């Protein structure tokens, strides 16, 4: 018999069951076979999975197959009928490229810990260098970018005594650093970092499939891993750190060490702050930029007698330009914060996540005024850092909420939209070409979960790589549901989408307030 095919994109809830397309089911399965069990195999393993066929759905056994192959939302599975109810399954990623599997067998099919054995380095889990235990070489796996995390190889963790708590700093070749919190999976002891890995890869030009090498250059206190330059293949096994690090990297490492001393000696340093209690040092954290909010140290506010003040606060840069922000006090904790303008202030002054700044209170009467002080190594030791106040329990809880939210964002970045007749104006042009005033609603849970609002700049990316600019507007005064206005008509025409068809889109953030909705595939697929 000729090999027949059908393929399905994996949508939320796909673990429970997979629906066989109606046309394929009626033509090649219904009424033809007495048995109700399909046999599935893939190139990733010699094992054959038996999956129950319940009507038009694959049920019992399907979840085991999906988990064993580490299938994710957005992946595409292609079924080729080899004989009777025996199928060969080809597994594709969202980009329609084949998912790469290593030599690891998927025959050990425990649904929990063995899941990650299916793919080689599924989330960027790396391999230690046999010559230098302080180094490891890893591959940027698509899943590590998809879930914004990097796992450390167990050999490297064991040899260097790395634990799943505390902080770690990743430093590139030029000395720029990224801070992460170490985590550990209770079920199997895997140590990993999450949130910020995608930003690190983007900044250093690392893409899916690239290899990279890290070397542990500092063990005491906060761990520091340095990204080593890629070497020719014949030298790839010899991983070594130059005897003298680049000056920028060395200075950055010293900065990290100074920050540690601040954390270890909060009380002693706070006492010496009497030299200049009007100053404090703060860290520009990713969460402060995302939420446009800076928490002010309690000790600083209290010592200057302004811990009860509300209203407005003015920030002035070195050139005298000013920004007016809202000053508020959280009733639950008494923590002071400034918002609505902090992100603009940072952007205008070249401050990015991870930057260290010094602010000085130069006016207490009427509206409070903080001035940005130039960062100089000599002055940095004279101005006592109260950044640990900013990293108070309140901030830690805030960051933990952000971490959980990022995890949810990663899992909910796909959305399915249906081109309903309601969204199409009554006058249709030739062969489903739609009028210019067409719009498309976005699901409320999707926009809320991903922090999309009316100020978000959104672009639509079609299957040909062409971008269509659209505008987000609230549908009514309740300001709940957003609709895309403009660009939608050209976008659906470019993707050949007609009335009552559904498409799956992927959300990709480019900057803090700008994002792209990328066309993945049509949900309802026709058998060719």
From Swiss-Prot:
Residues 3-95, 135-231, 279-376, 425-522 bind DNA. One of its GO terms (molecular function) is sequence-specific DNA binding. Keywords: DNA-binding, Nucleus, Repeat, Transcription, Transcription regulation. Residues 234-253 are annotated as: Disordered. It comes from the Eukaryota. It is found in: Nucleus. GO terms for biological process: embryo development ending in seed dormancy; positive regulation of auxin biosynthetic process. SUPFAM superfamilies: DNA-binding pseudobarrel domain (SSF101936). Its main location: nucleus. GO terms for cellular component: nucleus. Pfam families: B3. This is Putative B3 domain-containing protein REM15.
